[in-house]
Amino acid sequence: MANTLVGRKRIRKFFGKIKEVAEMPNLIEVQKASYDQFLMVDEPEGGRADEGLQSVFKSVFPISDFASTALLEFVRYTFEAPKYDVDECRQRGITFAAPLKVTLRLIVFDVDPDTQAKSVKDIKEQDVYMGDMPLMTENGTFIVNGTERVIVSQMHRSPGVFFDHDKGKTHSSGKLLFAARIIPYRGSWLDVEFDAKDIVHVRIDRKRKLPATSLLYALGLDGEEILSTFYNKVVYDRDGADWRVPFDAERMKGMKATVDLIDADSGEVVLEAGKKLNARNARQITEKGTKFLKATDEDLVGQYVAEDLVNAQTGEIWAEAGEEVTDKLLKSLEEVGITELPVLDIDHVNIGPYIRNTLAVDKNSNREGALFDIYRVMRPGEPPTLETAEAMFHSLFFDSERYDLSAVGRVKMNMRLDLDAADTVRTLRKEDMLAVVKALVELRDGKGEVDDIDHLGNRRVRSVGELMENQYRLGLLRMERAIRERMSQVDIDTVMPQDLINAKPAAAAVREFFGSSQLSQFMDQTNPLSEVTHKRRLSALGPGGLTRERAGFEVRDVHPTHYGRICPIETPEGPNIGLINSLATFARVNKYGFIETPFRRVRDGVVTDEVAYLSAMEEAKYYVAQANAQMDENRKLTEDLVVCRRAGEVIVVGPERVDLMDVSPKQLVSVAAALIPFLENDDANRALMGSNMQRQAVPLVRADAPFVGTGMEAVVARDSGAAIAARRAGIIDQVDATRIVIRATEEADANKPGVDIYRLQKFQRSNQSTCITQKPLVRVGEFVKKGEIIADGPSTEFGELALGRNVLVAFMPWNGYNFEDSILLSERIVKDDVFTSIHIEEFEVMARDTKLGPEEITRDIPNVSEEALKNLDEAGIVYIGAEVNAGDILVGKITPKGESPMTPEEKLLRAIFGEKASDVRDTSLRVPPGVTGTIVEVRVFNRHGVDKDERAQAIEREEIERLAKDRDDEQAILDRNTYARLADVLIGQAPVAGPKGFKKDTTLTRELINDYPRSQWWQFAVIDDRLMTEMEAMQKQYDESKKRLEQRFLDKVEKLQRGDELPPGVMKMVKVFVAVKRKIQPGDKMAGRHGNKGVVSRIVPIEDMPFLEDGTHADIVLNPLGVPSRMNVGQILETHLGWAAAGLGRKVSKAVDAYLKTQDIAPLREEMKAIYSPGELDGLTDEELAEAGNNVRRGVPMATPVFNGAKEADIEQMLEMAGLDRSAQSTLYDGRTGEPFDRKVTMGYIYMLKLHHLVDDKIHARSIGPYSLVTQQPLGGKAQFGGQRFGEMEVWALEAYGAAYTLQEMLTVKSDDVAGRTKVYEAIVRGDDTFEAGIPESFNVLVKEMRSLGLNVELTSSKKAANDQLEPPADAAE
């Protein structure tokens, strides 16, 4: 870390013992690599590979018309530059996308009417616009309609073949019924399954089942071939009254002899009944020379004939293949003199007669019948013909248009069934189906294992690119139908490709996917960690995945193959637990979509630095040692027995048998879990909460990196894109709060400018309304390398993730205020803005063109006092910096209302005073309840052709000035660099020509050259040709750069001045951003990193907080009872180490002060050398060391990586070094009495986060508000400004209490008695406090509903007098 610019400014002490050999992959590579592979924006030499977008076009094109007289071919595709850049898209609310142009070739044929021979008549090529394709931003997100979205990767079942059984649940006997299923990437599913009677059936697409032999018949096999495929043949030879059968040791090995085995030649008993034939006695029998065994007729009865026995002369069939051998059959065979009887090798123990039995029950006996049967199942009610049945069967599994196993499916199938088809064979073959049935029968015979569908070798990841590819294919297929029809309708000789294509379906498919797919999610942008985690998320839900209700326990559970691939900790609590997972830190996705994790190779017990990435299937073959296996200095494994994993089991083997070793202890957890120090000391449930709550931490006004970190903080800050990294090496030229200008020093590419300008985001709103703001970390003149952090973003400090603050905690009860996880805070926390955050709310208003006339944004609003307009400018828009409260006007807007007929008096008044205000109503944008803050930004959007108001013009002028400043700065640096290079070339030369007044052959010096204006330097001419060409090239490059710069500026200005694309009917739109400063207050939720969460119960004056002997007050008091039962001891260890870190910080602080006085760096260097590990301070200059020391005054930051961090001894050593008690407990004094507490208290620094559950967002009150239209009851919820529901149970409570009048009030005048509501109001205004309840509207709704069912209900009153007032129910609701 100390070798980067920012890393030198503050150095983190590292406790890790295990050296990491593998580089952690970029955290958002999953997204970027996948989408890049799909788009392939730049076409490589030799054309694009057949994947992604290219393969989609290739699979749909060429398209021919119905008569095959024309063909539309795909040539290539290209992307044009996007119209707007990322920031412009965000501001204007549009999608960041690039236009896709496809080159198509239309070939028209001439067909000879006699011979039907085709000849090419005409070929036309044209570029066709195919809609916009969304582009991914630098940070792996998409901008759709102005909001950032993430496409979450999906985990689904890998295509291929799976074998499984029903776990004995189907049949009452508990018998296992085996089944196989072939799952393609797209196409029909094929199931092969046993039933309780051991007959094999097939189902296609979960339809009605058929005997499996029907499928085999349909594949073209006949009965005899089916039997010979599945069974071996044994030939029995007549030997007098008995039979001779060949002795095959291999086949019979492991079988038990039911009768004595007798040698057919010698008559000797070679194996007694009841004994098992094992390798030893099989060898003995073979050595004796036994070739044949003796068999009797009894042995043959019950066997099955292997092939048809036919009389060659007459063609008479004596026995059919598969027929059972009976005494009767044997007799008849003896009579006709047959001495050889081939039977199937079925012993009912190791080999069962399942296929033979299936063949026997199958009513079909030929291909035609089988095809008809399959056709009837798939298309019931249609009469089959042989052609249609054959065509349908072919299209089910053998047609590449309809059926695609995908490369993955083929690879998986080859592995499972030991086949060797190339992975380009994407349809099923006859061999595949036979192999599946064979494997299934073998399973039933007890050979082999069923598959585990939760094994990560059987689940794969579909990332953005693949999801998008599938979606685009659907769009193109819809388009293809339209093109075919179009080609047949038009005169094909005169049209161009453009006229045939309507790209709407393709564009609509893309739009639908990004806008409304379950996997396209609104990005969680609360803080940088939540962004990274969202992009690394794996969901089992979504189209083609599981549903919450159907997912059982097994799918959600942690599986041994998750190790190093999927985090066992980070998953949501609740219904989605285990269905939404997170990728582990080192994991990556391979080309087949399987998750891989890295291992170090181990050879002969010696660990190498060679790293191999393996998927779950590949890993199963190896013995894998843990990352913490003990080694000597030569990396030889030292233990006699090493604990290893193999195929999901933990075993102990000798070091020479170890094949691989984990690369890092943190490779099994995800990014969020890897940020929890002392994770190994926390209970898993609490660690889960800890990793989930870090994602909800709100960025604070002042970020503060943790004293006790894990070393992952810098990685997350860099990869999330929150902190800005330098694109090229260079020297800082200018820095201010809004931008950093770097002069590039690496050899500049002629097309790139020699200067990089980084615009910093200032007070921008994130998706979750948190505040995104960046601040520079570099100073003018500093040199930065490529990739170094130059600016901090939200929740980062010195390029490290900083989600919360380090606060001084005391673990002790405090007058019940920290009962049940409540948190007690000191007033200092509020006063010093420790947990203050800024939230930016966005409000927008549109002025539309209505039927009655256009709405108008103006300051001139009827019946509004001047006081209410104090914050508006002359255009009626609030000015920046105004402080606004709930109800204040942000944008004045009036809407025309329909003219009502006027009375004569009104007409007269109107004629006299010209009063016009009555025909408009006030529809201004006001601040909603509960919001107070400062206006930080206003954006005004105008439709094309609508005149801009003064405010819009002012905003535009400001923006143009900013762009001009950027251009001028870039120009200045370009001038400086170019002319410096030119001066270097010219000085010392004696030009033969030059500007006016130059004497030729004068040797140029710097003073001489500076006498001329720089623009005239190009006029110097020297004799040296090489120098002249160099100067000319330099001048050309300079002129081009200058031109490009100016052009870029003009383009941007033109975009600004152009009108905006607004929704239809909208003339003008104004967006107002209000920044709300939220201090921490009782009711806010806070949490540590160990799942220790709580709600702030009280904020206590600092003088009442417990304090130490030196007068330091605790910032926060937590309840010690929150620790033991929750078993998250990590927080206590963190507190201890944080205490040591602060103590060491105090020591360094003293040394820095001494250095500032004496300017002697040696004592400071010694002090810091004692703290840090050897080598961590190497290469630091004195100034850098002093700066590093100054930056750790508050506490020396430490890194204790998960499973590889500080142990108790290390913590004690640090405490001693800091001069603190080894117990890390201190005597505390009660702030209110000044008395010491009886026992010492654990005190230290803990890292606390303020979560996004703020009381200000939840608290809500209503007096008068909106009512529901039908029921007339108040709406519910804060967003609707609703009331609190007085529900069924609350009614019971009032009934039980006997509070009849209160109850009546609740159910009528306070809810939905419309007339009663107004009467109550009038009575209260009059000062009268009696009122009567009427009929609630919900009663009328009920009556109306009953009437709609044809039940007439009428309300009659028993009181005669009351009848006059009560209207008949028919009109009650009107």
Curated annotation (Swiss-Prot):
PANTHER family from the UniProt entry: DNA-DIRECTED RNA POLYMERASE I SUBUNIT 2 (PTHR20856)
Subunit structure: The RNAP catalytic core consists of 2 alpha, 1 beta, 1 beta' and 1 omega subunit. When a sigma factor is associated with the core the holoenzyme is formed, which can initiate transcription.
Top-level taxon: Bacteria
EC number(s) given by UniProt: 2.7.7.6
Keywords: DNA-directed RNA polymerase, Nucleotidyltransferase, Transcription, Transferase
Function: DNA-dependent RNA polymerase catalyzes the transcription of DNA into RNA using the four ribonucleoside triphosphates as substrates.
A single BP term in Gene Ontology: DNA-templated transcription
Keyword Ribosomal protein: no
Pfam families given in the database record: RNA_pol_Rpb2_1, RNA_pol_Rpb2_2, RNA_pol_Rpb2_3, RNA_pol_Rpb2_45, RNA_pol_Rpb2_6, RNA_pol_Rpb2_7
Catalytic activity: RNA(n) + a ribonucleoside 5'-triphosphate = RNA(n+1) + diphosphate
InterPro entries according to UniProt: DNA-dir_RNA_pol_bsu_external_1, DNA-dir_RNA_pol_su2, DNA-dir_RNAP_su2_dom, DNA-dir_RNAP_su2_hyb_sf, RNA_pol_bsu_bac, RNA_pol_bsu_CS, RNA_pol_bsu_protrusion, RNA_pol_Rpb2_2
GO CC terms in record: DNA-directed RNA polymerase complex
Enzyme class per UniProt: transferase
Protein name in UniProt: DNA-directed RNA polymerase subunit beta
Family: Belongs to the RNA polymerase beta chain family.
GO molecular function annotations of the record: DNA binding; DNA-directed RNA polymerase activity; ribonucleoside binding
NCBIfam families per the UniProt record, alphabetical: PRK00405.1 (NF001616), rpoB (TIGR02013)
Residues annotated as transmembrane: none
Coiled-coil stretches noted in the UniProt entry, renumbered to this chain: none
Presence of keyword Repressor: no
CDD domains (alphabetical): RNA_pol_B_RPB2 (cd00653)
